[in-house]
Amino acid sequence: MPPTPPPAPTVLVTAAAPPPDPGPARCVLATITRRNEHSPLCGVKSLNALDNILAKLEASDRGADDALLRNTAGRIAESSLANVFAVKGGIAHTPPLAEGALPGIMRGAVMARCRVRETPLAVEDLARADEIFLTNSLGIRPVVALDDRGFAPGPVAASLADLAGGRG
């Protein structure tokens, strides 16, 4: 039986002040789930991304703000809430979309603004990074911890704060 035609669309618009700047992020590597970069749903931004929800819950349980998800090959794909950038030698590196990253709006803005290479990122690449930051529609957030490794907020993320309306 074919699906019934959808009803006429409804548009709902709400306006509210943006949430307060959450400050730098403390992250962990998710251990309970992986991002399936081969899934046809991989590039879909959805509130129903259970892997991301589970990773975020794991981060909270471990006292962190966010979790970085690895893909099925063990490389970094994204965080539970954002795209990931690792800076080395003044060049920002971010996983290609084929690694499981979402094509985020802020990701695109960062790529248009500064020197970025789409590079598959191993966990070891993050450990050797000069700085790590996350991007999503709410802004740019420096990462100050990944598991037991500390990082200082860096100049690349700071130089991009205006992209996020001063947040970052």
Model-derived regions: residue spans:
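Helix-start/capping segments and mature chain N-termini
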Residues: P2-G168
